[in-house]
Amino acid sequence: MTKYVYAFTEGDRDMKDLLGGKGANLAEMVKLGLPVPPGFTITTDACRAYLAAGESPETLDVEVTSHLRNVEQEMGKRLGDKNDPLLVSVRSGAKFSMPGMMETVLNIGLNDESVQGLAAQSGNERFAWDSYRRLIQMFGKTVQDIDGDRFADILHKLQADKGYKGDLDMTTADLKHLVEEFKKVVEEETGEAFPQDPRRQMDLAIEAVFRSWNTERAHIYRR
């Protein structure tokens, strides 16, 4: 059976064809004893299989679940936990560097409940709500193919109406308002509410990163 997922503790810098440059270098860093947060790499084989079939390989879900559980155990947190949520990022990594060409989604694991837990654990309510609005904005644009201007226009209007110079001027109340407005955009554009299931967020983000290999800008960069 093809192995599609490797923990950061597996592999080394010579496995760039399989793990991509980022994944191989993270594995090498762990091998050298450098401090690396727990995580895992989905192989380029999985990406190729997805692009060929239009869906993820049958066994990928099981492997991702197993590796996610290991990360949760190491971190002492659970993805989507309403009291102390684990947040993850889904990042791209071809075997050669393609800066800015493929997609990244941050703050996966936040939803209407876990944002409250992040606020309590961090002691910073503003940080938690800013992280959540950024997730919805990034997820909408990257994963759901919503025009980024839909979100940017709402953000800029709020700042203009209140005379703000930039993001740092926004209050917690402003950010909560943006979350609600951004969720409305997602529902208007997709016909569905922003996904509250953190695992669904992660799975959809993984597929979006796979698809980003074939975007026009990625094709142009590889020429």
Question: For each predicted feature, which ranges?
Answer:
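N-terminal beta-alpha lobe that positions the nucleotide/phosphoryl donor
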Residues: 1-223
